[in-house]
Amino acid sequence: MNDILIRIARRIKKNIIWIIAVPIILGAAGYILPSQIADQKSYTAEDTLAVGSYDHPVYNSTEEIPLLLKSDSFLKEALPDEKDEDVAEIKEKLTINTESKSLLTLSYSDEDKDRTESVLNAISSTFLKNDQKLYAEREAVIRSSIDALEGESVSEDSKVDKERFLYELKNTQLNLKAASVTDSETVSETAGGGMSPKKKAVLGVMIGLTIAFMFVVIPEFFRESF
């Protein structure tokens, strides 16, 4: 046993420089590299969308809207300056969740805060613009029907039917609703922050000491065994 300790001491003395250097290098690497990673952040912008109600098969459907918003044609309309590969990336980063029959949550994540907000804003704004146009067209048709029916002369026998039709049209007009964004926010999420730089530096030193111990001690025990 004394011989092993003597050989270990000699081995330590012979390799003292790198035995000290390895833990220091790994500790420094553990401090510097993780600190660079910890500084990276991703941002998520989120809009809550209240779906409109004017009997449109796509723009009033919480099942169809996610398909619409992720379609190439819609994204190119909303983001005309984006390249095809960028549109594909945006499609991957865009998340749409159905909260209820009339509410959707749109969220988009990116490392650049301004881009995160601008991309989601472009998507939401384009949807609302198209929705408002469709809503206005539907409302105009119903209003025109009401005006035409009110100005129409009918026989006494048809007055009841006329009043019933007018009631139904006016009730439909009252229930028409365009889509709207009810809530909007941007939150940041820090990536790579599981351990602080100091803790990772300590871990690097411990790994370095372990490597040095294995290099110095284990060969001597194997030599003793054989």
UniProtKB/Swiss-Prot annotation:
Metabolic or biological pathway, per its Swiss-Prot or TrEMBL entry: Cell wall biogenesis; teichuronic acid biosynthesis
Entry protein name: Teichuronic acid biosynthesis protein TuaF
Topology term for the membrane: Multi-pass membrane protein
Location within or outside the cell: Cell membrane
Entry-linked InterPro entries: LPS_length_determ_N_term
Organism of origin: Bacillus subtilis (strain 168)
Organism phylogeny: Bacteria, Bacillati, Bacillota, Bacilli, Bacillales
Coiled-coil residue windows: none
One GO term of the biological process aspect: teichuronic acid biosynthetic process
Gene Ontology cellular-component terms listed: plasma membrane
Induction: By phosphate starvation, via the PhoP/PhoR two-component regulatory system.
Domain of life (superkingdom): Bacteria
Miscellaneous note of the record: The nature of the anionic polymer present in the cell wall of B.subtilis depends on phosphate availability. Under phosphate-replete growth conditions teichoic acids are present, whereas under phosphate-depleted conditions, at least part of the wall teichoic acid is replaced with teichuronic acid, a non-phosphate containing anionic polymer. The synthesis of teichuronic acid is accompanied by degradation of teichoic acid and reutilization of liberated phosphate for other cellular processes such as nucleic acid synthesis.
Disulfide-bond pairs as recorded: none
Entries under Pfam families matching the protein: Wzz
Regions that span the bilayer: 15-35, 202-222
Keyword list, A-Z: Cell membrane, Cell wall biogenesis/degradation, Membrane, Stress response, Transmembrane, Transmembrane helix
